[in-house]
């Protein structure tokens, strides 16, 4: 069955979508739907099936029914299907980008950039499919000992709303390449691009049941998926609070759980840093995707020798940032993704006004729709290290500025956080930068560069920023399990009967 989802930049409408389960397009079994909202106007786009536990069960069973067949489909065939999917994504990039802009608020130029990168992930894992394997082990005697890396089986992919399509692709690409079957639950606020992606999976020729999409609320469909006893692996990207609940639900049936969670990432400017470059990265750090980025530079640490000059330059640069309609070519920052999240970010801005000094922003941009979820880039200074805006993840275009003079104190302040996802250092002295990087309790450190997600580099957090890694060959561990096989090449009944060395 063929179904086409489309978005139009002028009408801002999309044809009503259906879920994709076992190769078929289906409504929710209950018949229930819910609206998906355009963030730039606050108006409904279309209705989405409101899947529940019964829909999740059908999708998981479909994935389980073909799990063994897919596991033993040769890696070259799996790779060819992923490459065909990459071709289809490239061919449909403009349509995917427009749907992403419409549904999630990404400004169109950025959405295009993200969508055109997705084939890189699919191609990378297509290339890895027939190259990832176990190892041989040297053991005493005339014996052969080796390991196999086997797929987990059915994997659940619970996708966030900030980068819906990219995170979906980076998650399912290794899972499918390594022989797992997938059930995807996109965020309720941003489901349209996942359903368009399902069309392309279908067109690429993946067998029915290998890839499934169930839409619905996290508390209903998402929780049911994480708790399903036939799900052997769970990948979740989102808040630490929700991640804890996903881990609890998955732990009830001992599923392997991979979590990329919250962050309060520092951007550190050293006294010898090239300030123009550092200012540009600081703006990207908390304004990109309207600050709705797990690695957002929401803590800005400025050395006291350059702080005043840096802040002058920062304000000047922020005055050039255009906030507005994602489909307007001049826009550089779009809206927040939902009304609920908009209200949350505005509450944090009010908290910041009580805790610190507002240097820039703090309100709604002018010339934006009244019902859109727009917030100005916002900078607070004179921020105490124990302030809420310095410690809690806001997930909006808000940064807290703190000054520093001692590297030891700087590192202690950065590490005094429940999060440990990411850090950026701007420093010409590479020895000082490397020493600082080694002492930071985070999963990734970029020196004189901004976060650029790539399929070949591992991404993940320390502490309450998550477990496991997405991307890079390190991601293999999130989608496979080890099997050991030992062979005695000179079996002897007498020796076999000797239990002296047998484990107890």
Swiss-Prot record:
GO cellular component: cytoplasm
Superkingdom: Bacteria
Catalytic activities: 2-hydroxy-2-methylpropanal + NAD(+) + H2O = 2-hydroxy-2-methylpropanoate + NADH + 2 H(+)
Active site per database record: 260, 294
Signal peptide positions (record): none
UniProtKB keywords: Cytoplasm, NAD, Oxidoreductase
Pfam name, any one: Aldedh
Cross-referenced Gene3D superfamilies: Aldehyde Dehydrogenase, Chain A, domain 1, Aldehyde Dehydrogenase, Chain A, domain 2
Subcellular localization, as worded in the UniProt entry: Cytoplasm
Gene induction: Induced in the presence of MTBE or tert-butyl alcohol (TBA).
PROSITE patterns: ALDEHYDE_DEHYDR_GLU
GO molecular function: oxidoreductase activity, acting on the aldehyde or oxo group of donors, NAD or NADP as acceptor
EC number: 1.2.1.98
Entry function: Involved in the degradation of methyl tert-butyl ether (MTBE). Catalyzes the conversion of hydroxyisobutyraldehyde to hydroxyisobutyric acid (HIBA).
Family named by the database record: Belongs to the aldehyde dehydrogenase family.
The name this protein goes by in its record: Hydroxyisobutyraldehyde dehydrogenase
């Amino acid at each position: 069955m063929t179904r086409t989802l489309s978005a139009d930049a002028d009408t801002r409408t999309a044809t009503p979508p259906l879920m994709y389960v076992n190769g078929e397009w289906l409504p929710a079994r209950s018949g229930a739907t819910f609206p998906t909202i355009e963030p730039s106007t606050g108006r409904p786009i279309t209705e989405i099936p409101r899947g529940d536990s019964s829909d999740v069960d059908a999708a998981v069973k479909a994935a389980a029914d073909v799990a063994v067949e897919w596991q033993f489909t040769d890696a070259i065939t799996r790779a060819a299907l992923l490459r065909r999917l990459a071709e289809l994504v490239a061919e449909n990039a403009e349509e995917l980008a427009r749907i992403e802009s419409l549904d999630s608020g990404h400004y169109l130029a950025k959405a295009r950039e993200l969508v055109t990168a997705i084939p890189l992930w699919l191609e990378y894992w297509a290339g890895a499919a027939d190259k990832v394997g176990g190892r041989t082990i040297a053991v005493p005697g005339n014996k052969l000992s080796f390991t196999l890396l086997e797929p987990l089986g059915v994997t659940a992919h619970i996708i966030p709303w900030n980068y819906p399509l990219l995170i979906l692709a980076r998650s399912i690409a290794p899972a499918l390449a390594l022989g797992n079957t997938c059930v995807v639950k996109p965020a309720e606020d941003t489901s349209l691009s996942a359903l368009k992606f399902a069309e392309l999976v279908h067109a690429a020729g993946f067998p029915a049941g290998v890839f499934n999409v169930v839409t619905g609320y996290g508390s209903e469909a998402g929780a049911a998926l994480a708790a399903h006893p036939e799900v052997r692996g769970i990948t979740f990207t989102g808040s630490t609070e929700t991640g804890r609940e996903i881990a609890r639900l998955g732990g009830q049936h001992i599923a392997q759980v991979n979590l990329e969670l919250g962050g309060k990432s520092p951007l550190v400017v050293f006294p010898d840093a090239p300030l123009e470059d550092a200012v540009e990265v600081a703006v990207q750090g908390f304004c990109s995707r309207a600050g709705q980025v797990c690695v957002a530079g929401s803590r800005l640490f400025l050395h006291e020798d350059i702080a005043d000059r840096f802040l002058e330059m920062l304000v000047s640069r922020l005055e050039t940032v255009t906030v507005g309609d994602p489909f307007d070519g001049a826009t550089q920052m779009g809206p927040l993704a939902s009304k609920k999240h908009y209200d949350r970010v505005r509450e944090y801005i009010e908290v910041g006004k009580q805790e610190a000094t507002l240097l820039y922003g703090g309100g709604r941009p002018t010339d934006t729709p009244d019902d859109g979820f727009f917030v100005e880039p916002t900078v607070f200074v004179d921020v105490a290290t124990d302030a809420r805006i310095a410690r809690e993840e806001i997930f909006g275009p808000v940064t807290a500025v703190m000054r520093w003079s001692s590297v030891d104190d700087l590192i202690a302040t950065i590490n005094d956080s429940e999060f440990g996802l990411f850090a950026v250092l701007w420093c010409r002295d590479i020895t000082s930068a490397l020493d600082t990087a080694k002492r930071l309790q985070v999963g990734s450190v970029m020196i004189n560069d901004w976060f650029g997600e790539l399929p070949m580099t591992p991404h993940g957090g320390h502490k309450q920023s998550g477990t496991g890694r997405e991307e890079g060959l390190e991601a293999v561990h999130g989608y496979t399990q080890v099997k050991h096989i030992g062979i005695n090449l000179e079996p002897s009944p007498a020796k076999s009967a000797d239990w002296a060395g047998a484990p107890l």
